[in-house]
Amino acid sequence: MPFFYVLGVGLSTLEQKLTEMIKAPVEALGYELVGIEFIRSRTSTLRIYIDSEDGINVDDCADVSHQVSAVLDVEDPITVAYNLEVSSPGLHRPMFTAEHYTHYIGEEVAVVLRMAVQNRRKWQGVIKAVDGEMITVTVEGKDEVFALSNIQKANLVPHF
């Protein structure tokens, strides 16, 4: 099960520590740290999402990976073996902050909640509004309001 870190609102001390350690090096290279995802499993994964105004290519990911690896090797915050992945947010862009939702008002989003609302954890609809830490999504013509803290995972739904 993935653990997400919303910049500014951490799920755990580890996610906070990781973001504090890698945010400055990522930004020093000229990229935005969109968010991180730490997936705990038999082979754990630390996934770092980066972006820039010019987009992201493989060389950008490699540069950030080398820089972040060096920081993590020195600080050694993760006590289990893990794989490091660096990528762009991609077409199914993950949403981490209230600002991300605000930027994509009018776009379709798939949301997985930590705790069910109306006996449902999975929702898909159009982002209508953001009010502080509350996100309004229009689902089948009806507005549903979710607390950002209750969102386990959310991604844009691309249309082709």
Swiss-Prot record:
Signal peptide extent: none
Highest taxon of the lineage: Bacteria
Transmembrane segments: none
CDD domains: YlxS_C
Location of the protein in the cell: Cytoplasm
SUPFAM superfamilies for the chain: YhbC-like, C-terminal domain, YhbC-like, N-terminal domain
One Pfam family recorded for the sequence: DUF150_C
GO BP terms: ribosomal small subunit assembly; translation
Gene Ontology CC terms: cytosol
Disulfide bonds: none
Keyword annotations: Cytoplasm, Ribosome biogenesis
InterPro entries named in the record: Ribosome_maturation_RimP (IPR003728), RimP_C (IPR028998), RimP_C_sf (IPR036847), RimP_N (IPR028989), RimP_N_sf (IPR035956)
Annotated family: Belongs to the RimP family.
Function according to Swiss-Prot or TrEMBL: Required for maturation of 30S ribosomal subunits.
Record-given protein name: Ribosome maturation factor RimP
Source organism of the structure: Enterobacter sp. (strain 638)
